[in-house]
Amino acid sequence: MGPSSSLTTIVATVLLVTLFGSAYASNFFDEFDLTWGDHRGKIFNGGNMLSLSLDQVSGSGFKSKKEYLFGRIDMQLKLVAGNSAGTVTAYYLSSQGATHDEIDFEFLGNETGKPYVLHTNVFAQGKGDREQQFYLWFDPTKNFHTYSIVWRPQHIIFLVDNLPIRVFNNAEKLGVPFPKSQPMRIYSSLWNADDWATRGGLVKTDWSKAPFTAYYRGFNAAACTASSGCDPKFKSSFGDGKLQVATELNAYGRRRLRWVQKYFMIYNYCSDLKRFPRGFPPECKKSRV
């Protein structure tokens, strides 16, 4: 295969994933409830946009009406602009209770001109402590960008603009719990965490810049729900059809994953010797792609 045909294959792959992730945007009125923050959360533009705001009194949040058990979840976000130090925008899947499962994106704000930190984590049966953190290769406050979670029985894939940044593989054979039996809702919140979010809490929230606002659009869930079974779009992605690339990593996807982790990962619990002086958690052996 020559260079031109290789490039064509790569472009086609990216296009297929992009189409799968964005062609079925849903209405926020139909899919979500604003759960806290009084009127600081808003759904507008006919249900095509949602915003969360934070001031010195309160933050705000929302959750999905449906519970999901496996699927691909896409959301476009534009994060708090300017001096966002001390703020956290969280976007995640979670069940409830002491033994809950959870799949996290958390965006840790920073001082003007300094990069956001994207914090990821996976909880299974109430246990987390599986953090990986990244800088982004763009300014997430200037435009909307797509943040996706692919949740399958075999693995969880975190994607940013359809580029994989993290894979958490099922390592139950090694005795590691994996989220696979508890349906989860989608949650998001914007809140003050200046006791830890920016430089370990050294930089506090500048309330003179409030209200802080994050924006959402382009939600899509090609998924299985606890109440009505599997979306046909997600079912087709399990088969041999052209959409399989949307829930699996091909060779190009694995190369892009390695690129992100080489140049933009700033913390990986699987390489933290101070935290695990007696050996890394067993799932770390399966974390390489």
From Swiss-Prot:
Active site: E102 (nucleophile), E106 (proton donor)
Signal peptide as annotated in the record: 1-25
Catalytic activity entry: breaks a beta-(1->4) bond in the backbone of a xyloglucan and transfers the xyloglucanyl segment on to O-4 of the non-reducing terminal glucose residue of an acceptor, which can be a xyloglucan or an oligosaccharide of xyloglucan; xyloglucan + H2O = xyloglucan oligosaccharides
Description of post-translational modifications: Contains at least one intrachain disulfide bond essential for its enzymatic activity.
Residues annotated as glycosylated: N110
CDD domains: GH16_XET (cd02176)
EC number: 2.4.1.207, 3.2.1.151
pH dependence comment: Optimum pH is 6 for the XET activity.
GO molecular function: polysaccharide binding; xyloglucan-specific endo-beta-1,4-glucanase activity; xyloglucan:xyloglucosyl transferase activity
Statement: the UniProt record of this protein carries the keyword Protease: no
Disulfides per UniProt: C224-C230, C270-C284
Tissue/organ expression: Strongly expressed in roots, hypocotyls and cotyledons. Aslo detected in inflorescence stems and in the carpels and styles in flowers.
PROSITE patterns assigned to the protein according to its UniProt record, in alphabetical order: GH16_1, GH16_2
GO CC terms: apoplast
Residue numbers binding xyloglucan: E106, H119, T120, N121, D129, R130, E131, D195, W196, G200, R275
Keyword set, alphabetical order: Apoplast, Cell wall, Cell wall biogenesis/degradation, Disulfide bond, Glycoprotein, Glycosidase, Hydrolase, Secreted, Signal, Transferase
Compartments, as annotated in UniProt: Secreted, Cell wall; Secreted, Extracellular space, Apoplast
Principal location class: secreted
Site positions (Important for catalytic activity): D104
Entries under InterPro entries matching the protein: Beta-glucanase/XTH, ConA-like_dom_sf, GH16, GH16_AS, XET_C, XTH
Knockout or disruption consequences: No visible growth defects, but increased aluminum resistance.
Protein family membership: Belongs to the glycosyl hydrolase 16 family. XTH group 2 subfamily.
Functional description taken from the UniProt entry: Catalyzes xyloglucan endohydrolysis (XEH) and/or endotransglycosylation (XET). Cleaves and religates xyloglucan polymers, an essential constituent of the primary cell wall, and thereby participates in cell wall construction of growing tissues. Has a high XET activity, but little or no XEH activity in vitro. Acceptor preferences are XXXGol > XLLGol = XLFGol > XXLGol > XXFGol.
Protein's name in the database: Xyloglucan endotransglucosylase/hydrolase protein 15
Top-level taxonomy: Eukaryota, Viridiplantae, Streptophyta, Embryophyta, Tracheophyta
